[in-house]
Amino acid sequence: PELLTKNKESLDKLLPSHIYKFRALNEYAVNNLCERTLWFDSPLNMNDPYDGHLIYENPFNTYREITPDFIETMTMLGILNDSKGLLNNLESKKTTFFDLLKKLDMDSEVLRNILATSEKIHEQGLGNFNLNFLKKIYICSFSERFDSILMWAHYTNNHSGFCIEYDISKSDSRYHFRQCLYPVIYDENIFDLTSYLERDKGSNDYNNLYIIQAVIRKALDWSYEHEWRIIHPFGTLNGPQNLSTPKPSSVLLGSNFFNSIHLIKDESQKQLQVELALKIIKFCEQQKIILNIARYSLQKFLMERDYISYDDAYRKLREL
């Protein structure tokens, strides 16, 4: 993950040729398609409660190198008096604030109160940090697969919606659709920022994009999504909004696209869905965008796609 945020050139070599956006058949999604836009929002509003969250160790429990500045600070705070004698008894050149306190002649009850208070402050600070951090980041999610049964089921209302295909290989490298595109890394652990906070900002090893690793890390449970994200971090946007997309290279209709409309009993609701479907087909025809329809594979647990002409799509709508 660190390489992905540190060296964008290396990431470009990993980019898939196409990415896919799964949509339910509703007015908002169809307008996005026809206006060539997509909605970018904070991870706070996504369907994963852990989305974008990070952790860092309690600073009082983080190992720090014993430097003259550290000793001076501890002495000024009145924590160290006989600093030379105390430091000579330390087993290594690194220690934590807690370890220093434990070596002092301090009442055990006072020490426990200090530790408990510091943990409470740390938990509150971590919560506030995550909240404020995620408020300033805006993302849009995609998949590198169109053939996932679960993606069609979860994000297109049981295969009744559609999927937009974008050809990334033809996008300008400076365009946000490619420049800000990152793969999601699936892991057992939440991203830990501690080691990066300790790095010297003046060193060649420092990169303020390290924190993006929190936004591209998700639990292993989500790995079926094969997700890629366009990420606009830290003030590049002033709020949730629609942003432009490239021209779609293809639009895939769900395997249940036409039948789901046919089964609607309320005539007014049915007519609304027919009009939305008609809008998709007309847009693809006008823009010369390939129209496909998904179908179940007969050999594997995945979706395949077949070409469908505009005329055939219009005919299927008329027959509903």
Language-model segments: what does each one mean?
Residues 1-320:
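Partner-binding and oligomerization surfaces adjacent to conserved cores of proteins
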